[in-house]
Amino acid sequence: MVNNKRKEIENQENDNNDDNDGLLTYKKFKEDINYDSIRSKELQTIAKSLGLPIIGKKQEIYKRIEGYFLSKKVKSDLINSTTNQLQQQPQQPQQQRYVLLIKDVDQLEIYFWKAFRNMIIFKNIFSNFKSKQFGYHDLIGINENFLKSYSNSLEIIKDNIKGNINHQIIRSVNDILNIIKTLKKKDNETISFYNTLFSAFSSTTTQSIKSLIFQFDENIDLWIQRMILNENLVALDQFIKFFKINSDVLKKSIEMHINPSFFNVVTYNNLKIYNYLKSINAIPTSHIKQRFSNIDLSDSLSFDCKLKRLIKSYKLLVDPTNFKKIQEIHQQEEEEQKQQKLNSDKDYIEKLNQLILELSEIESIHFTNDQLNSTIKNLLNQTTTTTTTTTTTTTTTTPILITNNNNSGDIKDIIKKYYKSIYLFFKIIKEGNLYNRNLMKPIHYYLYFKKEKSLIQLYEIFCGKNYTHYLIFFKSILMDQNLEKNQILELVSNILDIENGVPFQNIGCIYNFNLRSFNSFCKVVFSINDTELIDHLIKTIKKLQLVYDSKTKFPSISEIISTNFQYINKNEIVDFFFENYRNETTLFDDQNQNWYNGHVNIIDHYEKLMESIEKRLRLNIVYYYDWFTNVNKINEKKYNINILLDQLKRAISKPLLYSFFNDSGYYYNKLLIIFGWSLENGNEFLINNILSNEQFKQPFRFSEIIDSVLPPNKMSNSVKLIFNNISKESIESKLYQVKVKFNFSYVHGYYYDDFIPLTSTISTTTTTTTTNSEEVGQFIIGETKSFDFTISPRILFVCLYYLDRVDDIFYLFDKIPEIFNSGYFSNFTQESYLYNICSSYYLGLFINYFIENLNDNTINHLYTCLCVASRKGFIQIFQDILSSNKNSQYLLKVRTKTNQSSLFQSNLLCDMVVNSINSSNFQLSNLLIDFIDFSPKNEKVLRSKIFKSSNNK
């Protein structure tokens, strides 16, 4: 039976060439093969005859075969369409076949691209550029970091596709998946990119089909699934258009691969995908959205989002036709359950219907582009000047009318209707409740639309048992409403005085002061940077400390000022503290450590005040480091390391004003990190002073410092600053001393340990604003000083590598070959380390050096380098080896009893190939398997690994 079915399918497949109707094959499969009656083994036989995997459950194999015929139908349609288009096009003369689409191109630009594309000229021109550590050919594979780190990542991929450069960037299906997961922005560049991608990897490509690693139209259904599940609308839309996929194929693919519950999840991108598919009639009946789960539209409902995002979210969610079906479900449930409690939902439905009707009369064209691209918060806070005289100016908040339709009402009322409609919808579908973080109304909704809520009620909602959004709460009510000064002053009093300070008492334990809440409140008040407001806060707290001392224990005024000084950015507030609260705060005490602030103007002004009263500041490296990192962590900002480095530079440059507190080992660890940041940012002045300043005299261990700033692409110049005066001969002498002392047999317990002492010199070239030598810590501009440090062999070699001094490494190996016998160089050449730092250019140099200097130890290093090249996908390295008959015979042939000239046994070469397979470098994998003389058994195992790995991606 099964053989007959298989022959029918194969015959039908051949007949396709005559009638060009792939759908007949699919229909034949559906008609002749009944899922319930056919056995798994029969399906496996059919799958095998079609060249499909036979592993899996019965349902998986069935869907695999079904998807195969769907893809054949799409491919057949695409080829027929392309053929018809070509036949309909009139024949063009040969000289008119290629037309330059961009007109008026400058002649110099044409010459430039001719030279740029000519590899011989290109290499000759750029041969003088010494930085060979990283280049275009080192970009292997695609991941999220690659796509986001390179601003021209799309152009790099497109250039790679057009040039067919060894498939080094797109090596497998997994690389395409990473693209789909990441590139979702709808713009002309992304659309053009996806069209290029689909064209390059399809049956219509101009490349040889055999050279393709895969074809999109071989697995149409699976790619539809992947784009939907990754919520990539722009890729899905272009995919459907490029391959001319009709709604029947889409429906069948969704039925086969998408769980109906996927569309019940409600996110902005999920709604966009669902409504798009619905608009092209591609949603199967079984997948029509009827229930809602895991709703998260918090980003779209934030008052910081743009108006057009809110309108789009409303249209995606409260779709009138979809809402009509929900009403029908509601009525059906009411009839079945006959419960009175559903009557309340009727009111919600009636209200929502009315709002839908009102909002349907307001189209987006009634809003200006400025309004659509403004945030909700800005629109609601917008003010206009209504009265202006020679003596006074009155500014009042006014309704903002929609410019194109004065009957539509003010924008505040319209925005409220959008929000109200969405939250009514949540109530109707039984998903909204007060304690659902993703569904609760944002605090701004209450501030703008629900003003009847009291302050204490709002606090209980947003800062009560379930939420601790203190900072968001206080910032929203004090800073986001565009309030007048007197209103803010009144709010501060009310917050402090609510039921004897309830906002600052822990719920359920009234005597336990809530410091987090209070600190958040003070942070917001100080961040407003208004002298009157801060003074009002301090005076009000003083009164409350007397009145409510037994119930609410507020911190001291000194602690409040010191803790929040970091949020001050106006000099007049510093003067205010100096003149009015000098005796109530430690901020102006001698040797105090409460002055930390990230604003240069504040520090500069504060320093002058301290000098005027002849007081000094103390800089505790540990405290300052911890403060800096914690502030950035709280603010969720990326560290601006230069703020910390510049402050240290100021302090070191002013020894009469600053004293340093050094806390032994803990201090040393922090200083190492700071030194690493200095290296990374090329802060030459700070490096000079740390290394030469007596206050920081330490036996610097450079291994830890440099290791903290890897990888190399940011530190080459900084390492050069340290090593510029250290010759290979001086390094050789130090290594020789170590050899005599230890004979490279003494192995430290941890390979980071430094034991090679080196001496370097640094010249101060950085200028300063003062000529007073005391102001730069006795370090005279232009003077050269030496300093000693220790370094491990591994990091020594790393530094030489970063400085493009690989020849010096080889020189040291030649002079002191015993270094190969130690456990130290192997740490440099171990696979995990080389993988992280080594480019294809330098890896090739290492391989060639080891080939020319073969011995028992270098063979191990050679094998490690080959494994790294295999894992990274540096196919050119292996092609160079294969081009040399001598090298290929003993490097890439199996060592056996009869072939002792080869270096590596079968298991080692197998592992090398597996490295390339595991990193999806399948083209390299096949190249190696084709050349290496593996046994039939090993070859079968390796090819099976390739098949499984490529199909699992």
Curated annotation (Swiss-Prot):
Acidic residues bias: start-end ranges? 11-21
Q: Any keyword Lipid metabolism?
A: no
Q: Name one GO molecular function term.
A: DNA binding
Pfam families attached to this UniProt entry: SAP_new25
Which InterPro entries does the UniProt record give? SAP_dom (IPR003034), UPF0746_actin_org (IPR051904)
What range(s) does the SAP domain occupy?
Answer: 35-69
The yes or no answer to whether the keyword Transferase is present is no
Could you tell me the keywords of this UniProt record? DNA-binding
Q: Specify the superkingdom.
A: Eukaryota
For the region Disordered, what residue ranges are annotated?
1-23
Where are stretches of biased composition, namely Basic and acidic residues?
Answer: 1-10
Classification via PANTHER family: UPF0746 PROTEIN DDB_G0280785-RELATED
Q: Which family does it belong to?
A: Belongs to the UPF0746 family.
Protein name in the entry: UPF0746 protein DDB_G0281301
Native source organism of the sequence: Dictyostelium discoideum (Social amoeba)
Species classification: Eukaryota, Amoebozoa, Evosea, Eumycetozoa, Dictyostelia
